[in-house]
Swiss-Prot record:
Subcellular location: Secreted; Nematocyst
Family of the protein in this entry: Belongs to the sea anemone sodium channel inhibitory toxin family. Type II subfamily.
Miscellaneous remark of the record: A synonymy between H.magnifica and R.crispa is controversial.
InterPro entries tied to this protein: Anenome_toxin, Myo_ane_neurotoxin_sf
GO molecular function terms noted in the UniProt entry: sodium channel regulator activity; toxin activity
Signal sequence extent: none
UniProt-recorded name of the protein: Delta-stichotoxin-Hcr1e
Length: 48
């Protein structure tokens, strides 16, 4: 599932969701892109 990163923009309707939901921790080579912490899942994307 996709998720909204912090820099995707504040407007949920027009923002592009560039992140991917990952369980607990992001995969190697990925970074958490959402400041809000949830114990169940993180919003991650590939490191540039």
């Amino acid at each position: 599932a996709s998720c909204k990163c912090d820099d995707d923009g504040p407007d949920v309707r027009s923002a592009t969701f560039t992140g991917t939901v990952d369980f607990a921790y992001c995969n190697a080579g990925w970074e958490k892109c959402l400041a809000v912490y949830t114990p169940v899942a993180s919003c991650c994307r590939k490191k540039k």
